[in-house]
Amino acid sequence: GGILEFFQLSDDINISSTRYFYSPEVNFSGGSLLPTDQTVYGFSALCATDALLYSVLIADKDPNQFNKICSFDWKGNEIAKYQTDCLVFNLCASDTDTNRLYAIAISQEKGFYLVSFDLE
């Protein structure tokens, strides 16, 4: 499933917004969540700047299709969606270099390797 919850942190913790993308279609057995044939995998790696939240989005029944990146504002509104030419394992963003996103990608041929994406 894919759910994003945003929280306001002050004297206590309050949910400021919740976005539902894919309902969690899973079975619960022996204290574990188990995927079904209907399970759509949602978000993987997350990173944030003061302005935006970035996430690897799977959006597929195959959990190995992590080649989409979404950006959201802090109210949970989707700003952009990017299709990558590689499988993105983890993300890193910078407040000073706002037009570039850095990532660790993975492939059978290269193993883990560094990539960057121009967001302009």
Q: What is the role of each PLM region?
A:
Residues 35-72:
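Loop/turn-rich, solvent-exposed surfaces of beta-rich toroidal or solenoidal domains
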Residues 41-46, 87-96:
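Conserved beta-propeller blade repeats
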Residues 2-5, 69, 110-114:
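Structural signal for beta-propeller blades
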Residues 7-19, 79, 117-120:
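Short loop/turn segments immediately following beta-strands, especially the blade-tip
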Residues 65-78, 114-120:
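Beta-propeller blade signature
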Residues 10-38, 86, 95:
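Surface-exposed loop and turn segments in beta-propeller and other repeat-based domains
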Residues 91-120:
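Blade-level signature of beta-propeller repeat domains, shared across WD40, Kelch, NHL, RCC1
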Residues 1, 56-59, 103-107:
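Recurrent small/Gly-Pro-centered beta-turn motifs in extracellular repeat architectures
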